[in-house]
Amino acid sequence: MFYDFVPQSRFLLGTAGYPSPQILQQAAEASKSEIITVSLRREGGQGGAFRELLTQLNKRILPNTAGCHTVKEAVTTAHMARELFNTRWIKLEVIGHADTLQPDPFALVEAARILCADGFQVFPYTTEDLILGEKLLEAGCELLMPWGAPIGSGQGLRNIEGLRSMRSWFKDIPLIIDAGIGSPSQAALAMEMGFDAILLNTAVAKAQDPRRMAQAFAAAIRAGYDARGAGLIERRDMATASTPIFGMAQFSSQEW
């Protein structure tokens, strides 16, 4: 589903901002996630200790270009990550606005085109814009990672109709909700809408109990995925009785 990898878990977990390496390890194990995202800047800042922790976790690593604002920065960071982690995967972020952390669509497409041509398997952090999604696919990406809301905001799925349209438009493309998820119920809703996976970081890292929150998200994501597969009933404007009339007792008016 994700290029050459078919995960059992639909939960991708970020590794930044945890109170301690021990709590990160507990949360990652509790999440049952098979894929964790890692910032090259974090790796560079903590060196061997963090690398040892990643080895202990024994999960597939998805390096990212967090903090990059230009094509050159993103491409350079991606090449460094490939050499360091020995992977073709790269979560491509090219930030266009410092306050909203919204991706720069023009730089994102250009960087994606360069990296795909260089043999990378690109996971692009994007918005729900359909044209931008088309351009990223044309550039060589085989999946898309639309945001639910701005990074770290916890707002959930801020543009539900836009995300529904994206899911409908890209029927056969893996879509991973990336950013803005704040609660397990929001993650479950995204899965019920037909998205393929959820990537989140802050909602677990900043929880009072990250390990327990990771468990909650894992359960919610699984529940949403199963509910979608089981077939959700259609919403109705009016009530529909669930109890059949057949078999009800019949009384004669004379008895009253």
Curated annotation (Swiss-Prot):
- Pfam families under this entry? ThiG (PF05690)
Q: Which reaction does it catalyse?
A: [ThiS sulfur-carrier protein]-C-terminal-Gly-aminoethanethioate + 2-iminoacetate + 1-deoxy-D-xylulose 5-phosphate = [ThiS sulfur-carrier protein]-C-terminal Gly-Gly + 2-[(2R,5Z)-2-carboxy-4-methylthiazol-5(2H)-ylidene]ethyl phosphate + 2 H2O + H(+)
A GO molecular function held by the record? thiazole synthase activity
Tell me, in one coarse class, where this protein mainly resides. Answer: cytoplasm
The residues annotated as the active site are: 91
What the record says about family reads: Belongs to the ThiG family.
Q: Return the protein name.
A: Thiazole synthase
Native organism taxonomy? Bacteria, Pseudomonadati, Pseudomonadota, Gammaproteobacteria, Enterobacterales
The record's gene field reads thiG
